[in-house]
Amino acid sequence: MPKVKKVFIGSGIRHDLVLKDQTYGLQYLKEIIRHHISGQLKVAPEHSEDHILALMGKPPIKSFVEFFRCFQKINRQMGKKQFLTCYFIAAYPGCTRQDMERLNRFNRRVLKFKPRQIQIFTPSPSTPATLMYYTGKAYDSGKSIFVEKDKRNKEKQKNLILKGLSG
């Protein structure tokens, strides 16, 4: 396109797929960092606890941690000051208050910042997550899981991240 000078990523990328691609993943990340981020890149680790990530069909948190460290390292090497905006979900089926407390500690210890993008899980039609929400069972094993259905407690889960452990 002749009049387009730059293209920036506005909605984010799948961090889990970047480093999984051992042929082009690192090259792709460097290209994005060098030319296609306007200061912040959105990513969705969604949680820190592996058992919640498994219910979401996502890889273990070590995958995100590796991406996060790689992102920071490449930015340092390129002399750039760019940041990740992380999106998390509270009250996902299987998620307890204790899981959110662990997520809060993960954010302080690993990310070293308090994320602002926290959404309370909302059931949507025809998804494994909604099936788990209504049945209280893991979609893959049929085992019983905790599901927070009280609106106040869902807000408390969210506020654990937004306000810290006192929330």
Which residue ranges define each predicted feature?
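Acidic, glycine-enriched active-site microenvironments
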Residues: 167
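Flexible glycine/acidic-rich beta-alpha junction loops that bind and position SAM and/or redox cofactors
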Residues: 17-20, 46-58, 79-98, 111-148, ...
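Non-catalytic positions within long, well-ordered alpha-helices that form the structural scaffold/packing
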Residues: 33, 108-109
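Short, glycine/acidic-rich beta->alpha junctions
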Residues: 24, 98-101
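Conserved SAM/AdoMet-binding glycine-rich loop
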Residues: 1-85, 90-93
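N-terminal intrinsically disordered, low-complexity, charge/repeat-rich segments that act as generic
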Residues: 101-102, 106, 114
